[in-house]
């Protein structure tokens, strides 16, 4: 690695964003006659998919409130569909199943999906929603549901396998992916432009840098000597709020229920769509019947043969610490601080049982 001293493009991070950028940049350079993938290197302090991309649930959907995000995700879904095998992509669809308080917002998403020709079906009303779900799952029993948005496209990808597939496509284009290289800083020229990336194995001179380190973005931000606080303008009132912390960490709660993934097959024996339920119905423990919450709650889930079970999660929560005090390393399941506890397990499995009877009694 110490022999690599220069590359026109350096991408920091071998997760979904870094690898996707490398792959598409290589294709674009070639198409424009401005270079090839050989002009790009991806460096990662560990290995491909060692951050969030390697452990995430891998859901691929178009269910976003922002119109720009919907158009971007429609484009992304089309890319996944180009090679499902290489990307380990399962095009099973996605379902947003909601209570009345979300009805208007979900209807808006449906209308905007129609505007960009993204195929989906929208079901309204308690009875029609219940019948629709029973046609898919004979044991469906979630209460208080008044809208179902069923996206025909989308689904999920097996995290590690999809990243390996994406990396292989980038490498076919000539991109070099180098593991075990830690960024320690950036060097600038007299105009303040980044001229090289400093690493633990030597400096690499470059023309362009793409920073895609996922949860380690703050560390890169600090190396670039960017501000700790920012000012944000309210688009409706015009009021500018000062000294807002640039970084606030959220902890995503996800896990896997250790059952046969085929337990979640549909009535016709097929693999099911990804299920996302948001409801304000009271949630009771499947273990002892005690009340877990009488406020709004939500979960998402799907079968996963990589982890061997039913994988999914619930709403993330804000990490109640200053950003400088949050220990990102060790990351993921190796972290003693950010692994889910029994409270999440009880809530999530009870929520599964609330939605489908087949999950009742599966709590260890």
What is each of the regions a protein language model found here?
Residues 24-31, 39, 45-120:
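Conserved FAD-binding subdomain of flavin-dependent enzymes
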Residues 4-7, 198-208:
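Core beta-strand elements of the Rossmann-like FAD/NAD(P) dinucleotide-binding domain
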Residues 81-82, 101-179, 184-193, 198:
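Flavin (FAD/FMN) cofactor-binding and adjacent substrate-gating region
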Residues 17, 21, 48, 216:
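Conserved Rossmann-like nucleotide-cofactor binding loop
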Residues 255-364:
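Active-site lid/adjacent beta-loop-alpha segment flanking the redox-cofactor pocket in flavoenzymes
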Residues 203-291:
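Central helical "cap/lid" subdomain
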Residues 23, 27-31, 168, 172, ...:
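Short, well-ordered alpha-helices that flank and scaffold nucleotide-derived cofactor binding pockets
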Residues 7-41:
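N-terminal Rossmann-like FAD-binding beta1-loop-alpha1 element of flavoenzymes
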